Design a protein with these regions (language model features):
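Noncatalytic carbohydrate-binding groove/subsite architecture in carbohydrate-active enzymes
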Residues: 272, 283-417, 421
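C-terminal active-site-proximal or functional interface alpha/beta core segments in diverse enzymes
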Residues: 379, 388-475, 480-481
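Non-catalytic accessory regions flanking glycosidase/transglycosidase catalytic cores in CAZymes
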Residues: 81, 93, 97-273, 282-311, ...
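Short amphipathic helical patch at the helix-1/turn junction of helix-turn-helix
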Residues: 9-10, 57-59
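Basic/polar phosphate-binding segments, predominantly the helix-turn-helix DNA-binding elements
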Residues: 4-6, 11-48, 68-90
Length: 611
C-alpha cells in the first residue's frame, strides 16, 4: 500500500481507491494503515508531497504554481498553507532562505546518501520482483556451509525422543459419525494415536439425555450409543481423555461410572483419563469442594483412576500463576495446558522482541511451567493438549503462509518437555472458521476438509520417521544414526509478522542456500530425499488452483489428496569417503535425507567406529 502511494502521490489519490484495489473496506484499511505506519493516510500523503515540493524548491527554478500542480496539491494556496504549517515559512521564503542550494552542483548518483524512512524502505523491499512462474526464489541469505565427520561422534549421544500423539474431537457424539471414525482409523495407520481427547465436558453431551441410564427404556436409550463409542475406542487400543470442571455434577458422574463399571472390563476403565478444569473465577473453597468430590467418586468406582488439572496459563510469567499455590496440584496425577504463540504477540503493534520470542514460544512456556513445578518439588507429567506457532487470524495468513520448518522446530523442542501433545482431527471439528470471518488459531488441525492433510500432518509424518542417536544438531541441521543408517534433516526456519509479510515479494527473500558435506561415508548407499515446502506438499496452494465458485468436486479432492504430500526422490550413490549436497531451501522448507547402506560381498559401507 505504501508503494502504491509513493507511485501515485503526484495525482489526485484517495484511500477509497486503494481500498477498492485491495478488495477491503475503507474503514478497515484506514485503521490498519495507522497501526502499521503510525500516521493516517492523509497525513502520510501530505508529508510525502511536501517533502518532494521542498526538494523541488531547492533544486529547480520552477514556480510554486507548477510545483503544486506536479506534486498533486489541489491548489497553490493549499500547498502554501500546508508548507507554512510544517516549515513556518511560505514556499517563496523557504527558497530565499536557502539560496546556495540552487547553485550547488548535484553530486553523482552513486554518491548521494540520505536517511530513508522505515515505511519507505519497507515499501521498496516489498515491491514484487518481475519473475516468471517457474523462477526459483531469490536467495539473499549467505550460504550455510556444514562439514561433519561421522567418525567424530559424541561420547554419550542423546537419543531423539518422541512424545505421544493425542487427537481431539469436539464432542463425545462425534465418535458416532462414520466419517470421523474412518478418518481416525486412517490416521492411526499412518501416525500412531495414543488417545482421543473429547474437548467439551463429556457429561454435557446430548447422549446424556433423559433416560440414558433407565433400564426400563428400550436399549437403555442413549446408553447403547455410549457403550458403542467406548467399546470401539477400547478395540482401537486408545486411551480416552474426558473433561470435567467446577460445575460438573458429581451425582451424574457417579451414575455414569456405576453403569460403566457394570458394562466394561477393567482394562477399558483403566484407559480413561479425567481432566478437571481449574477455574480462576471460582473461590478456593468452591474449587476444593468440587475437586475432592469428583476425586472421591473416581477412586471409589474405578480400579486405577487418573485425574489431572487443566489450566490456561497467562501468556507472560506463567510460573507465578495462583494455581501453583493451590494444594490441589499436589493431589493431581498430571498437569494439562495449552501454548499458543499468537497470544504472545499483538499483531497490531510491531514489537521485534516479542516477534523473536514467539519463534519458540510453546517451548519457553513449557520450561517456565516445569521450573515452577520443580520449585515446589512437584514431579507431574505435562500434557500439552493444544498449541500453535505464530500465524495470523485470517485465511490468507493462517493458510497460505507455509510454516513447515517452524512447526518442526517447535515439535522437536516440546517433545522433550511433555508427556503427550494434542492436535485436532480436522478444521471442521476444531471450529477454525469463526462467524466474524476470523480464524481460531489457538490450536493445530491435522486435516482440512475431506481428510486433506494440512502441513502439520506431514511435519508429524517426517518427525515420526526420525530415530536414533543425535550426532549433530543446530538450528538448521539434525543428524541421526540408527543401526548403520543415517538421517539428515535440514530446515530453513523463518518467523515473521504475518501482517507485514507479502507472500509474492517478501517471503521469497528468505530462501536459504546451503552446502552440507558428510565425511566418512564409503561404499554404496541409497539416498532418499523427502522435500516439504510451499510447492511440494503444501495444501492451500493446491486448493487455490481450483477457481470455480462451486469448489472442488470428488475427483478434485482425490487429486488434492494425491498431490498434497512431500516430494520424494531416490538415488543410488557409490561414495568415496564423503557425501556432498549443495542446494537451497525456501522459507520454512524441510528436507529429510535418509541414508541406507547397500551391502556388497566383502564390503562394509558403514564408517569405521571410534577407537
Amino acid at each position: 500500500m505504501v508503494a502504491r502511494i509513493d507511485a501515485n502521490y503526484q495525482r489526485r489519490f484517495s484511500l477509497q481507491e486503494v481500498a477498492a484495489a485491495e478488495f477491503v473496506s475503507e474503514a478497515w484499511l484506514s485503521r490498519l494503515f495507522h497501526k502499521e505506519v503510525g500516521v493516517s493516510f492523509v497525513q502520510y500523503l501530505t508529508a510525502l508531497r511536501l517533502r518532494h515540493a521542498a526538494d523541488q524548491l531547492l533544486t529547480t527554478r520552477k514556480p510554486a504554481q507548477q510545483i503544486a500542480r506536479e506534486q498533486g496539491f489541489a491548489s497553490t494556496r493549499m500547498m502554501s498553507d500546508l508548507f507554512k504549517r510544517q516549515h513556518g515559512v511560505t514556499p517563496r521564503q523557504y527558497r530565499e532562505q536557502h539560496p546556495r542550494e540552487l547553485a550547488r552542483p548535484r553530486p553523482p548518483q552513486a554518491d548521494r546518501w540520505q536517511p530513508v524512512a522505515v515505511d519507505r524502505l519497507y515499501a521498496r523491499l516489498n515491491e514484487p520482483e518481475p519473475r516468471d512462474r517457474e523462477s526459483p526464489p531469490l536467495p539473499i541469505n549467505p550460504p550455510q556451509t556444514r562439514e561433519i565427520n561421522l567418525h567424530d561422534r559424541p561420547a554419550r549421544a542423546a537419543v531423539l525422543r518422541h512424545t505421544r500423539m493425542v487427537v481431539t474431537v469436539r464432542e463425545l457424539d462425534d465418535l458416532l459419525r462414520e466419517d470421523v471414525r474412518r478418518e481416525l482409523e486412517q490416521l492411526h495407520r499412518a501416525l500412531p494415536v495414543y488417545a482421543i481427547d473429547i474437548n467439551d465436558p463429556f457429561l454435557s453431551s446430548r447422549l446424556f439425555g433423559t433416560g440414558w441410564d433407565d433400564p426400563q427404556m428400550a436399549g437403555y436409550a442413549c446408553w447403547y450409543n455410549l457403550q458403542q463409542i467406548f467399546s470401539w475406542l477400547a478395540a482401537m487400543g486408545w486411551n480416552v481423555i474426558l473433561h470435567t470442571g467446577v460445575t460438573t455434577r458429581s451425582d451424574l458422574l457417579q451414575r455414569f461410572l456405576l453403569l460403566a463399571a457394570n458394562h466394561f472390563p477393567p482394562a477399558t476403565l483403566n484407559s480413561w483419563r479425567f481432566v478437571w478444569h481449574w477455574s480462576p473465577q471460582a473461590s478456593e473453597a468452591t474449587r476444593q469442594a468440587a475437586w475432592r468430590q469428583q476425586r472421591e467418586v473416581l477412586h471409589r468406582l474405578l480400579p486405577q483412576p487418573q485425574l489431572g488439572i487443566w489450566h490456561r496459563f497467562a501468556p507472560s510469567d506463567p510460573g507465578n500463576d495462583p494455581l501453583f499455590h493451590s494444594p490441589l496440584l499436589a493431589e493431581a496425577d498430571f498437569l494439562a495446558c495449552q501454548a499458543d504463540a499468537n497470544e504472545q504477540l499483538d499483531l497490531a503493534q510491531a514489537d521485534s522482541s516479542r516477534l523473536a520470542s514467539s519463534e519458540h514460544y510453546p517451548l519457553h512456556k513449557l520450561r517456565q511451567i516445569h521450573s515452577a513445578l520443580r520449585q515446589r518439588q512437584l514431579n507431574l507429567p505435562l500434557w500439552l493438549l493444544s498449541w500453535n506457532t505464530l500465524t495470523g487470524d485470517t485465511r490468507d495468513t493462517n493458510g497460505r503462509f507455509f510454516r513447515g520448518a517452524l512447526l518442526m522446530d517447535n515439535l522437536l523442542g516440546v517433545a522433550d518437555q511433555v508427556w503427550l501433545a494434542g492436535f485436532w482431527l480436522n478444521s471442521g471439528l476444531q471450529g477454525e472458521a469463526r462467524a466474524n470471518g476470523k480464524l481460531d488459531t489457538s490450536s493445530l488441525a491435522l486435516h482440512y476438509l475431506h481428510g486433506l492433510p494440512r502441513p502439520v500432518y506431514w511435519v508429524l509424518w517426517l518427525w515420526r520417521r526420525l530415530r536414533g542417536e543425535i550426532l549433530f544438531q543446530d538450528k538448521n541441521l539434525l543428524l541421526l544414526h540408527h543401526q548403520g543408517h543415517y538421517q539428515l534433516l535440514l530446515r530453513n526456519t523463518v518467523v515473521y509478522n504475518p501482517w507485514l509479510s507479502s507472500e509474492a515479494a517478501f517471503i521469497q527473500r528468505f530462501s536459504q542456500p546451503y552446502s552440507v558435506r558428510l565425511q566418512g561415508l564409503e561404499g554404496g548407499w541409497r539416498v532418499k530425499q523427502h522435500l516439504f515446502d510451499q510447492h511440494h506438499g503444501a495444501l492451500f496452494p493446491l486448493v487455490d488452483a481450483f477457481r470455480s465458485r462451486s469448489g472442488p468436486d470428488a475427483e478434485d479432492y482425490q487429486w488434492l489428496m494425491h498431490r498434497a504430500r512431500p516430494a520424494l526422490s531416490v538415488e543410488d550413490a557409490r561414495l568415496d569417503g564423503h557425501w556432498l549436497r549443495v542446494d537451497s531451501l525456501e522459507s520454512n522448507a524441510l528436507a529429510l535425507y535418509e541414508f541406507t547402506p547397500q551391502r556388497a560381498p566383502g564390503e562394509d559401507p558403514a564408517p569405521a567406529s571410534n577407537p
